[in-house]
Amino acid sequence: MCAEATTLDELIKALDDAVSGPADKDRSCMRELLLPEARLSPISKHPDGIYAPHTLTLDEWTEAVRKRGHDVLTEHQVKVKAETYGHLAHLWSTYELRLQPDGPPTVRGINSIQAVFDGKRWRILEILWQVETPDQPIPEKYLP
């Protein structure tokens, strides 16, 4: 059963749970967290040197994760700053990815999450993220 995110803390925990797991994991809980029109957009450097988002639907993201293949991947938000107004929230979160739940982080980055409260629960409209690189380390103010 998927957890309903009635608070932003619950939304972050549910997102970590939905993203984490084997590549072929059932993503129905992820689907419950996202609005139907939600987009998942990693920012990456293109061969021409320009950084740009690559916008995916949940189905496209799920297929990309499946194709990448891994036994288990664990995501954990290590620092989250939330700004809210009415039914709108912006979550700026630093995340870590691990190949083993208790192993060292293999990837870190920043998520920019737009969420909407529908009167009962928080749901995600957009996740835009960028992975940390040697030339763009995560600033200290975003680290735990």
What are these regions (language model features)?
Residues 108-137:
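Short beta-strand edge/turn micro-motifs at domain boundaries
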Residues 1-33, 142-144:
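Short, low-complexity N-terminal intrinsically disordered segments enriched in polar/charged residues
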Residues 34-36, 78, 109-111:
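Residues that flank catalytic or metal-binding motifs in active/ligand-binding sites
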Residues 24, 74, 107-110, 137, ...:
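Non-catalytic cap/lid and distal C-terminal segments of serine-dependent acyl enzymes
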Residues 39-102:
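Surface-exposed, charged secondary-structure patches
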Residues 15, 30, 38, 91, ...:
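Hydrophobic pocket/interface hotspot
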Residues 19, 34, 95-97, 128-129:
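Short beta-strand segments enriched in hydrophobic/aromatic residues
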Residues 51-53, 102-105, 133-141:
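A short, polar/proline- and glycine-enriched secondary-structure boundary/capping micro-motif
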